[in-house]
Amino acid sequence: MNAFVMHAFRTRRLDVWYGGEAWRPLVHVRDCAYAHIQCIESEPSTVRGKTFNVVQDNYQILDLAQRVKATLGLMDINVEIDVNRDHVDRRSYRTSGDLMKRQLGYSAAVTPEAAVHEIADALRTGVFTNFDHPAYYNLPWMKLLLDIEDRISKTGPIV
């Protein structure tokens, strides 16, 4: 979502590939932090041995693009959506946060619209400026971390 909004903010367009039909679960990092706190503060017997998914909801990519466009539009940032339907994205997946809600009474609350507004505000105020830094993109960031890990294993730690 971060890169999606950053691209829309930067170029005033959103490229939606594969028709945007693929599903993605979304959660804001703040909701993840609260979920971790909830688990830490819970009775150990309530969380021991359990795997909890933290998800606000599941969305199709095209729906997210439309939500980004609408939210940015309310901020006087007009964005066009270009949908490419040439291929099918096989990486479609959904998940459920029902176990966490049942066991701990916790549900993620930050909506995509709230997240878009937060990210756009940060971009407008210059909090983020180097849009091409690998930290903003999952695959380049993971590659960079692996490269650094490899380098440190060969040279040893600095301190």
Language model features: what each stretch is:
Residues 1-16, 26-27, 35:
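Oxidoreductase cofactor-interface core, primarily capturing Rossmann-like NAD(P)-dependent enzymes
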Residues 17-159:
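C-terminal substrate-binding subdomain of Rossmann-fold SDR/epimerase-dehydratase oxidoreductases
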